[in-house]
UniProtKB/Swiss-Prot annotation:
It comes from Arabidopsis thaliana (Mouse-ear cress). This is Classical arabinogalactan protein 9. The lineage of its organism: Eukaryota, Viridiplantae, Streptophyta, Embryophyta, Tracheophyta. A lipid is attached at G172 (GPI-anchor amidated glycine). The modification Pyrrolidone carboxylic acid is found at Q21. PANTHER family: CLASSICAL ARABINOGALACTAN PROTEIN 9, LYSINE-RICH ARABINOGALACTAN PROTEIN 17-RELATED. Keywords: Cell membrane, Glycoprotein, GPI-anchor, Hydroxylation, Lipoprotein, Membrane, Proteoglycan, Pyrrolidone carboxylic acid, Signal.
Length: 191
């Protein structure tokens, strides 16, 4: 558009320069009346074609956006049934207190055993005195007659010696007494 305008201006200047030169004629006495030189009408520049209207309007929206999917209906939770009331756990009874062991009575101090009564010492029985056997008188010799001055036999020698049965009785009696004493001591300890 600017180029066409510059070309038109150049053409106008050239035409004006050509027509403005004077003719080479001889001088006359009467000058010719000046001819009004009207410049030719300026060439009008070609009409600038208006640019076509820019139709950059956005295309009409033909398809409406799909409706947003409605959220799924919230399913109402089932009514919460109250949990069955469970009875509180029964507290287990405390363990039985261990009863103290029964106090055992202190052992009764047993008295020291009494020394056993020693059985009475057995009195040795007197040995029977045996008379020495006198030699039998010979038939030829006659026994001497006792003189009147010689003492007669004593009563001790004449008393009979204790028989063996008496000695046995004394031993049995002493054993019986000692066994009775020993038995009574045992019974006393048991009580």
């Amino acid at each position: 558009m600017a180029r066409s305008f510059a070309i038109a201006v150049i053409c106008i200047v050239l035409i004006a320069g050509v027509t403005g030169q004077a003719p080479t004629s001889p001088p006359t006495a009467t000058p010719a009346p000046p001819t009004p030189t009207t410049p030719p009408p300026a060439a009008t520049p070609p009409p600038v074609s208006a640019p076509p209207p820019v139709t950059t309007s956005p295309p009409p929206v033909t398809t409406a956006p799909p409706p947003a999917n409605p959220p799924p209906p919230v399913s109402s939770p089932p009514p919460a049934s109250p949990p069955p009331a469970t009875p509180p756990p029964v507290a287990s009874p405390p363990p039985p207190v261990a009863s103290p062991p029964p106090a055992t009575p202190p052992p009764v101090a047993t008295p020291p055993p009494a020394p056993l009564a020693s059985p009475p010492a057995q009195v040795p029985a007197p040995a029977p005195t045996t008379k020495p056997d006198s030699p039998s008188p010979s038939p030829s010799s006659s026994p001497p007659l006792p003189s009147s001055d010689a003492p007669g036999p004593s009563t001790d020698s004449i008393s009979p010696a204790p028989s063996p049965t008496d000695v046995n009785d004394q031993n049995g009696a002493s054993k019986m007494v000692s066994s009775l004493v020993f038995g009574s001591v045992l019974v006393w300890f048991m009580i």
